[in-house]
Regions:
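Short aromatic-glycine-(Arg/Gly/Cys) micro-motifs in beta-strand/loop hairpins
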Residues: 1-24
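Hydrophobic beta-strand residues in large extracellular and virion-surface proteins
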Residues: 3-5, 28, 34, 51, ...
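Short, surface-exposed beta-strand-loop junctions and turns on beta-sheet-rich folds
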Residues: 11, 20, 33, 42-44
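Extended catalytic/binding region for NAD+/ADP-ribose chemistry, centered on the ART fold
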Residues: 20-37
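Short, mixed-charge low-complexity intrinsically disordered segments
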Residues: 39-80
Length: 80
């Protein structure tokens, strides 16, 4: 699985699924799919964001950048 994060602060693209709790991190099932989505948004998005594989370390970093505990992070596939 892959996520797209803002290069400056590593905050991932998220989706608001409910009124309370943290937003869910949007995931893609393959790097090419995530890159295609990013490129479809234009050059500014490509310059500002990067595609990262979801690993224990990257998930911990994304949770930290969102200000939540790693165990509170929810992943949701794109499109949802």
């Amino acid at each position: 699985m892959f996520a797209i994060v803002y290069k400056e602060d590593r905050v991932p693209m998220c989706a608001r699924l409910r009124e309370t709790g943290p937003d869910a991190i949007v995931t893609w099932d393959g790097e090419p799919n995530a890159r295609q989505f990013l490129e479809s948004k234009g050059a500014e998005f490509v310059a500002a964001y990067s595609v990262v594989a979801i690993t224990d370390d990257s998930l911990r970093d994304m949770a930290h950048s969102m200000g939540v505990k790693e165990e509170d992070v929810e992943l949701v596939p794109f499109p949802s």
